[in-house]
Regions:
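Phosphate/pyrophosphate-binding active-site segments
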Residues: 1, 145-148, 213, 311-410, ...
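N-terminal alpha/beta PP-like core and its mobile active-site loop of ThDP/TPP-dependent enzymes
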Residues: 1-356, 399, 482-485, 505-506, ...
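Conserved short loop/turn motifs at secondary-structure junctions
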Residues: 226-231, 381-382, 462
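Active-site diphosphate/adenylate-binding microenvironment
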Residues: 6-9, 14-19, 27, 32-36, ...
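Hydrophobic, well-ordered secondary-structure segments
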Residues: 299-303, 310, 345-353, 360-372, ...
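Thiamine diphosphate
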Residues: 108-125, 272, 323-326, 333-335, ...
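N-terminal cationic-hydrophobic initiation segments that often serve targeting/anchoring roles
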Residues: 61, 161, 242, 397, ...
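Active-site nucleophile and cofactor-binding loops and adjacent substrate-binding regions
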Residues: 24-26, 45-55, 70-77, 145-146, ...
Length: 613
């Protein structure tokens, strides 16, 4: 059958379950735009910037492991998308990117045969060989140089994006091939055998029994659960086996929504900007079962030799390189798919008797949660001028129903959000922890909302971050998405303000906002009203509660600005400590700032403290 190549691409996506596409149209992708935009099984959301399209596609895939395609044009269309793609790469999110390219006979790649080996930058108008830029941030990146290879490259790209450790793939299609016709019956296909040979083997029974025995005999075991559990499709198995193991569960940023706060097994969030209970569990543990978490530098801290120093670590990961990092000690590396491992662990664990009998240890973790909450009583007190950002995040999240949707931007939104947000049963929170780009919140909320069936979605944004993708306020309205935008206004780039306060006390501030005199922000009331949003704001905790309740009760999108204190520090957090003699040290993760009295900290420890010298 003869078919236009672009229609073949659209049919391929629909046949593989894709229902949504994010795009900014362009001349270099004209036939792709036409085919995707008119396909009966595909809905295209048109953004105002390709970075927003890429971030929306990334956040979309987080909700249910379902891919939304991303279509961009040649030249700046592709380069604009890079931040969203690298975010997906570092957080292992599947993404399927199709870009337009200039006519193949006007590419530098084609012209290379005439230049006697001399490099040529470009030939075509707006030409750029995007695959050279995206190769390090994708599992597969190719320019289609032969139209008859379209089936092969589509099948290979899809397989690699969704198999093993997920990630982005990118197919660059010259515009003359997009509009050309192919004979679909004779197209060669892709055989995944060679690529699949690099996948981990099935988990064997000996490994499962080893893990169960270690847990049975551990006095202070911890289940360190990561986002790879969801990526593998192993969430149901995780919930089932967690009940059987009966050990404290610790999460971190990408994985905070694996378990609700009120679950008796949930202990806390570990890492350099986690909480005290989560870090105390990890630091006191004698056994850590880490599944689907790469245990990043944020989780072990910069004094990583003191991380989990009394624990025997079992790490289950689909990427062997992650278990060999110099920042970790892994006594029992298990190269495996998280779903396969969890299902076999669940099948082998006794259904009625908990594997672990360390009830006192679990009770200790629950005591820590009660005695050392993420939001402190003083943060609920009024200061006369602003709301408290910790109180705001806690109150907002506590008012949400089960199965709610939230997208979190970076800066205050992600730091406080991941410390103080109340995870309700079935709730989802999308945030990008690895690249952590400003501008994430609005487009991530768009992707989250669409993936979640266009249900009400909370967007936590910052006054600095929102400026990076402000134009997406219109995309929300155009598509009638019920997104509640809560803007944390801390008068600029607050995380950088804190860094400058800590490191450059003798210098004036630079580049952070009005106080540095070189960067300013608009009145967001005027911005919201110009776009057509109902606007409200709060300058106190009492006002904050009122505007949160009103926004959640309102129909459709809303814009709420929460003014917060520019002196607010992130707490608790890993921080350099100055000793009485002036020496600067990096404490281990059990010792977070604001620092507790040494005697109080020692009472929480089952192992010796690290000497302060």
């Amino acid at each position: 059958m003869k078919q236009r190549l672009s229609d073949y691409v659209a049919d391929f996506l629909a046949a593989h379950g894709v229902t949504d596409v994010f795009s900014v149209v362009g001349g270099g992708a004209m036939h792709l735009n036409d085919a995707l935009g008119h396909h009966p099984a595909l809905h295209v959301t048109y953004n105002h910037h390709e970075q927003a399209s890429a971030i929306a596609a990334e956040a979309y895939a987080r909700i249910d492991n379902k891919i939304a395609a991303l279509c961009v044009t040649t030249g700046p269309g592709g380069t604009n998308a890079l931040t969203g793609v690298v975010g997906a790469w570092l957080d292992s999110i599947p993404m399927f990117v199709i870009s337009g390219q200039v006519r193949y006979d006007t590419t530098a790649r084609y012209a290379a045969q005439f230049t006697d080996g001399l490099p040529l930058r470009a030939v075509g108008d707006q030409e750029y060989d995007i695959t050279k830029s995206v190769a390090p941030m994708t599992k597969y990146a190719t320019m289609l140089e032969d139209p008859n290879q379209i089936r092969y490259v589509l099948e290979k790209a899809w397989h690699l994006a969704t198999t093993g450790r997920p990630g982005p793939v990118w197919i660059d299609i010259p515009v003359n091939y997009q509009g050309g016709y192919i004979e679909t019956d004779s197209l060669p296909g892709y055989d995944p055998a060679q690529d699949d040979a690099r996948l981990p083997p099935p988990v064997d029974d000996a490994t499962v029994q080893m893990v169960l025995e270690k847990i049975r005999h551990a006095k202070r075991p911890v289940f360190h659960a990561g986002y790879g559990i969801r990526l593998s499709g192993g969430y149901a198995a995780f919930r089932a086996v967690a009940e059987k193991l009966n050990i404290p569960i610790v999460t971190y940023w990408n994985a905070v929504d694996l378990i609700e706060d009120e679950n008796p097994l949930y202990c806390g969030r570990a890492g350099n900007m986690g909480d005290r209970p989560g870090n105390w569990a990890i630091q006191n543990a004698d056994l850590i079962l880490a599944v689907g978490t790469r245990i990043s530098i944020r989780q072990v801290g910069y004094n990583w030799k003191t991380w989990a120093r009394a624990a025997e670590v079992i790490m289950v990961d689909i990427d062997r390189a992650e278990m060999k990092k110099h920042t970790l000690h892994v006594e029992h590396p298990v190269w495996a798919d998280a779903k396969d491992f969890l299902q076999k662990l669940d099948a082998a664990a006794a259904p009625l008797t908990p594997v672990s009998q360390a009830a006192d240890w679990l009770a200790t973790c629950q005591r820590w949660k009660k005695d050392y909450p993420a939001v402190l009583p003083r943060q609920w007190e009024e200061n006369g001028t602003t709301a408290n950002v910790y109180a705001f995040v806690r109150y907002l999240s506590s008012r949400l129903p089960e199965n709610s949707l939230t997208a979190v931007s970076n800066g205050a939104c992600c730091v406080v959000g991941n410390q103080a947000y109340v995870i309700q049963k079935g709730s989802r929170m999308a945030n990008n922890s690895a690249i952590a780009s400003m501008g994430y919140g609005l487009p991530a909320a768009i992707g989250t909302c669409i993936a979640g069936g266009r249900r009400t979605t909370i967007c936590l944004e910052g006054d600095g971050s929102i400026m990076m993708n402000l134009q997406e306020l219109q995309t929300i309205l155009t598509n009638k998405l019920p997104i509640k935008i809560f803007l944390i206004n801390n008068n600029g780039y607050h995380s950088i303000r804190l860094t400058q306060n800590n490191l450059f006390k003798d210098h004036c501030k630079i580049g952070i906002g009005p106080e540095s005199g070189d960067l300013s922000f608009p009145e967001f009331r005027k911005i919201a009203e110009a776009f057509g949003y109902p606007y409200s704001c709060a300058h106190s905790n009492a006002e904050m509660k009122q505007v949160v309740d009103a926004a959640l009760a309102a129909e459709g999108p809303t814009f709420c600005e929460i003014f917060t204190d520019t002196q607010q520090v992130w707490e608790p957090k890993s921080a350099t400590k100055r000793l009485p003699d002036g020496t600067l040290v990096s404490p281990p993760l059990e010792d977070l700032a604001p620092f507790l009295p040494r005697e109080e900290l020692e009472k929480q420890m089952f192992i010796p403290l690290v000497p302060e010298q």
